[in-house]
Amino acid sequence: MKKIAILGSTGSIGTQTLDIVRLNKDLKVTVLTANKNINLIFTQILEFCPEFVCIFDIMEAELLKERLETAYREGQIEKIPEITTGVEGLIEAAAYENSDMVVTAVVGMIGIRPTIAAINAGKDIALANKETLVCAGHIIMKLAGEKGVNIYPVDSEHSAIFQCLQGRADNRIRRLLLTASGGPFLYTPIEELKDVTLERALKHPNWSMGAKVTIDSSTMVNKGLEVCEARWLFDTEPDKIEVVIQPQSIVHSAVEFEDGSVIAQMGVPDMKLPISYALTYPERRFVSDNYLDLFSLSKLDFIKPDLNKFKGLRLAFTAITEGGSLPTVFNAANEAAVALFIQKKIGYLDIVNIIEENLNRHIKIDYPDVDDIERIQREIIYGV
């Protein structure tokens, strides 16, 4: 029985992780956390009976306690789980003794310290939180190596590369080929991007994701963040990572070796596939009967990204190559700008302009620690 802690159980990755748990009787959920969606986590608690729960929002945590006490009196649950709140509660959840693996599906910088706590506690990590590696990859991967902890990628692209490298660790890699769908504006002329609305940006052609990730995909900032993740996950320099637009989202990524061989991972666009592989590695278990039908594919397209049109991707490569604290600046400025765009306070093109402005005025720290990373994040979030 593998015991799972899910940080961010009410989000897109969290709910799909629970779908995988439902399919596998040897997976047991012992920890659930959420920001403030107590309606959903209440139903999850009734179904999965975790031992430990964290609700980040203190007021919502009190409301959840009341509902659980009522449920206990009515016989809906046998035991009320321990409930904590805030950052410290999230860190406790990550290091909870009775879990073997931590799924980090929280969104934002809040995921860094809990991931560090989980690694220090010897937990394997199913990593879905981009910021952990984008901002603190130099810290996380070193610590994981020291503690003998496995980090399994949940992003479809990184999972694909991870799969392509199985049994080939000693082979020389020439390039990591990180695929991208190109988002909803792949074929939109650059001069029309200034008129993009929130509603249009939220319509991804292939994937069902949360709002922020969907917008990040439309600007290709998301792919820039994934390049940074790949740099740390696979210990590869940025100049050996190439982004390839694959509009059908069938080829999830590939690895080119020095002998010229290219190994790619293909499948239907379904996040449950990489989630399941991370939870049950090295096994491949049934996820759904939605299999890839090669005969139904008329073609597979591969397109070089336009770095003038998708300036966010170009800025990401600059930040990653220069390193230090610049990836944190890139991430924080994007997070702040996307939040403003979702609130309809800025235009679509302002997102990338805000990122560029913050990168240009930042004085780089070569080896930022977690305190540096969090300080930079706060300064940018409050300054935008």
Briefly describe each language-model feature range.
Residues 1-384:
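Catalytic, metal-anchored helix/loop core of enzyme active sites in primary metabolism
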